[in-house]
């Protein structure tokens, strides 16, 4: 990863924060699904592009790694990057975002811009019939 792309991102620090430093010399085919997800996230972040588009970046991760990944994505937002995430894991992302778009069968069915608690309640009301 370090030599593949010239970027202002501190690769060593990024890999350390994601917990993947010990695995950098291993072929990805020998990594677990979760570790592969972490490597993919590190690669996306390391590009330095102003926009990150991530499809299910938390799938295959244990709760600790999901938090680590959310922290990394939050750091990128705080640095001024825009992050678009496609995910089914609402609980993990509720504290990370300020906007949620619910898409069903390719159609936008609802947009919510609010606090994480309001968002969770809106989701429950809309998709699970309330608490």
Regions found by a protein language model. Give the residues of each.
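Conserved ABC ATPase "signature" region
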Residues: 3-24
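Catalytic Walker B motif of ABC-type/P-loop ATPase nucleotide-binding domains
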Residues: 52-56
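H-loop/switch region of ABC-family ATPase nucleotide-binding domains
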Residues: 86-88
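Helix N-cap at the start of a conserved alpha-helix in ABC-type nucleotide-binding domains
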Residues: 63-64
